[in-house]
UniProtKB/Swiss-Prot annotation:
A single GO BP: proteolysis
Family: Belongs to the peptidase S1C family.
Leading EC class: hydrolase
Described purpose of this protein according to its UniProt entry: Serine protease that shows proteolytic activity against a non-specific substrate beta-casein. Promotes or induces cell death either by direct binding to and inhibition of BIRC proteins (also called inhibitor of apoptosis proteins, IAPs), leading to an increase in caspase activity, or by a BIRC inhibition-independent, caspase-independent and serine protease activity-dependent mechanism. Can antagonize antiapoptotic activity of th/Diap1 by directly inducing the degradation of th/Diap1.
Active-site residues, as the UniProt record annotates them: 157 (charge relay system), 189 (charge relay system), 266 (charge relay system)
Enzyme Commission code: 3.4.21.108
Organism: Drosophila erecta
Name by which UniProt lists this protein: Serine protease HTRA2, mitochondrial
Ranges that cross the membrane: 64-82
Amino acid sequence: MALRGSHRLQVILKRCIASPLFHSHAPNRRSSQPAIKGGEPNSNGNSGHDQQNGERKGKGWRRLVSFFVPFSLGAVVSAAVIKREDFTPTIAASKMTGRRRDFNFIADVVAGCADSVVYIEIKDTRHFDYFSGQPITASNGSGFIIEQNGLILTNAHVVINKPHTMVQVRLSDGRTFPATIEDVDQTSDLATLRIQVNNLSVMRLGKSSTLRSGEWVVALGSPLALSNTVTAGVISSTQRASQELGLRNRDINYLQTDAAITFGNSGGPLVNLDGEAIGVNSMKVTAGISFAIPIDYVKVFLERAAEKRKKGSAYKTGYPVKRYMGITMLTLTPDILFELKSRSQNMPSNLTHGVLVWKVIVGSPAHSGGLQPGDIVTHINKKEIKNSSDVYDALADNSKNLDIVILRGVKQMHVTITPEDP
């Protein structure tokens, strides 16, 4: 294309040179210059006038060439650019073909196991919506189906968090069923529910003992009641001891991940790239720091629960029943405090201990008293709070009201809570 254009330009230039107009107009700018003295002939026998005409012809040629050459070069470059634009995207597109199919491993995981993830709602049977007349939602969370006949695994704090409630489960296809709580281990924060449905999609259980730091994982659940929400990340640690997290009476090495785990997807599965549950989403401390209960520990709980059911009784362990406040909390250990201070400028630099309020149940005494997620409890009834055990001890006290000192950002505040009797 470029060569053909150059050939045509040469033809045009030759025709212009042969044209009388070219020779007649070329001398105009040089007419004021003096002629060769006496008009004597040169060494070739031509007169000075002929020599002058020759010089004018040469200069006219150079002017015309200098005028047209930039356009010729521009045409060549433009042709090259057009040719490159014609072919480069085609080559790039051909190289990218199939990448969605070959490299979307997260989507493959979700497609294989999302149907076994459920949304769990806790309804308060004492408070009703003004317009619908239905019980209001006190709390929500996630779970996943582990048996085709309707057995569901979740966190204990998702379902055992408030008296006078009922549990509803919504499947991935939108169907909703009432659920009964079968087994509870509040020490490890695990529970099972059952709905009266058969032939359900089941989540496969993997092995958490073979996990390595840096492995990709996917957290599935229903944060903010948005079913089948997916977050992804990597395993940050496979051996985060419960003592490091300040969790009372728990002998668990938690999985730490940077996949986002929130209120709604706690209780849902943490899944490896083979589509197997390798943990139960449990809690989030801050952005990039979340924890899950390893599936190997969960299997021990399920085996004990199955043995109890064979004997005709339910498997229930945990703390003695205390008065109810309505929060999920986490002890601020030195390691967790260091992480929080490094990630947030709103953390007081002199804070050395306390309990982080991770979740507040709607309609609970804590909610009515003004506690909010993210508050840090430092004192209750003038007693220093260093871990979650101190909060349980305060609930066991006979005081009617709890005067709680909290930090909300860098601001210190007082709230008063009246716990409910069991």
